[in-house]
């Protein structure tokens, strides 16, 4: 099968240098057609792993199957991130195993039960008015500037406010949260070369612990209080679990939604008919199409615990299996005209919040609401937004990130 592929020798689907320039759209489409489960060879030590490579899973049905079979495909074994900064050693990868993202059942089940109490539709809905007011303020303030960096001035703040609001983080501390989360996900990008992801994570964890101590003494109506008081089947969160959960919230909740907002606006400028439609109709289906189109997390991985097979391909115990959500979300067998941005797409069974199963994004409702509120505000106050430059992409092996995007907010540029 490999002989029929047009991939250059040594092509690596988690190579951050590729994502700094572009998404490997054509290469993934070719794999879906020719070799939907393909062995990606890697030199020993590449991206923090010494196992010689991984399986690239490109089709929607296979991504969903790997997600579902959590008894066979483990998040814990080698964590869910398919790429670490080159030079990362095994102990550093091991340290991430406390994060909910990297847990397996039954421990994952206990933790998720505790945390899910904070993400009920009612808990999320309670934030709507505050976040709507904030979204309108963010967009009005940026519009008054005339032009600027859409990522920094528009996209980044509301996702952070949503998570911080849920956690009960005081307003004066919220920019610290933003700063730490940026440092943690940008560690493969030269712009953030001075960043120390480890130090940022330590600061974030210690901030979380401090917040927990305050809430233990003075409970509030927020996520941190719920986590501190939580007891599911005799299980309370340990300090490590709590600290790493704060990291997951600050990074997973903030970075992914921010990138969806930026990439969604990029899509609207590329498909102006959809922007006209959105401004008139404000369809409820738009947020899911924005997430499908953006797929902010390009891929996560699992590791086979036993010899198994996936769509006829033999997978050995210990081999990594990387689910390319980006590919699954453009699978021609599932999505009609997948390369058309269509805000009325319904049904839209995208895997932008992860596949089905135990690790489906716990904050999906909050993300949808944040995206909705933000685009409503943009349509209200920046209906004629125009790009001034090409977006600058983040160098990352798994996050489809945009660092900067210069735009004209009022639409005077031609």
Where are these regions (language model features)?
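Cytochrome P450
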Residues: 1-414
């Amino acid at each position: 099968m490999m002989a029929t592929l047009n991939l250059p020798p040594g092509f690596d689907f988690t190579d951050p240098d590729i994502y700094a320039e572009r998404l490997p759209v054509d290469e993934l489409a070719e794999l879906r057609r020719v070799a939907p489960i393909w062995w990606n060879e890697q030199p020993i030590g590449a991206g923090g792993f010494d196992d010689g490579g991984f399986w690239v899973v490109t089709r929607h049905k296979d991504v969903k199957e790997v997600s579902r079979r959590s008894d066979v495909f483990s998040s814990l074994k080698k964590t869910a991130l398919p790429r670490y900064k080159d030079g990362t050693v095994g102990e550093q990868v091991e340290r991430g195993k406390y994060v909910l993202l990297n847990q397996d059942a039954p421990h994952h089940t206990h933790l998720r039960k505790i945390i899910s109490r904070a993400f009920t539709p009612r808990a999320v809905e309670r934030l709507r008015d505050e976040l709507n007011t904030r979204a309108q303020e963010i967009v009005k303030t940026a519009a008054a500037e005339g032009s600027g960096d859409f990522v920094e001035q528009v996209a980044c703040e509301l996702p952070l406010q949503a998570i911080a609001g849920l956690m009960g983080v005081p307003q004066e501390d919220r920019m610290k949260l933003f700063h730490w989360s940026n440092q943690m996900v940008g560690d493969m990008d030269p712009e953030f070369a001075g960043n120390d992801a480890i130090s940022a994570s330590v600061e974030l964890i210690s901030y979380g612990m401090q917040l927990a101590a305050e809430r233990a003494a003075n409970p509030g109506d927020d996520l941190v209080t719920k986590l501190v008081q939580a007891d599911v089947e005799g299980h309370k969160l340990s300090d490590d679990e709590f600290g790493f959960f704060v990291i997951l919230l600050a990074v997973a909740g903030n970075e992914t939604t921010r990138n969806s907002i930026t990439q969604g606006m990029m899509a609207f400028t590329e498909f102006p008919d959809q922007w006209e439609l959105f401004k008139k109709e404000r369809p409820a289906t738009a947020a899911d199409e924005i997430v499908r189109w953006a797929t902010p997390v390009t891929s996560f991985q699992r590791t086979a615990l036993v010899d198994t097979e996936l769509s006829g391909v033999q997978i050995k115990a210990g081999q990594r299996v990387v689910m390319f959500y980006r590919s699954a979300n453009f699978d021609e067998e599932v999505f009609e005209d997948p390369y058309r941005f269509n805000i009325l797409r319904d049904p839209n069974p995208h895997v932008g919040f992860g596949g089905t199963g135990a690790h489906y994004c716990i904050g999906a409702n909050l993300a949808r609401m944040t995206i909705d509120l933000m685009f409503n505000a943009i349509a209200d106050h920046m209906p004629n937004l125009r790009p001034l430059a090409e977006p600058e992409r983040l160098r990352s092996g798994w996050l489809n990130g945009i660092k900067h995007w210069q735009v004209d907010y009022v639409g005077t540029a031609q």
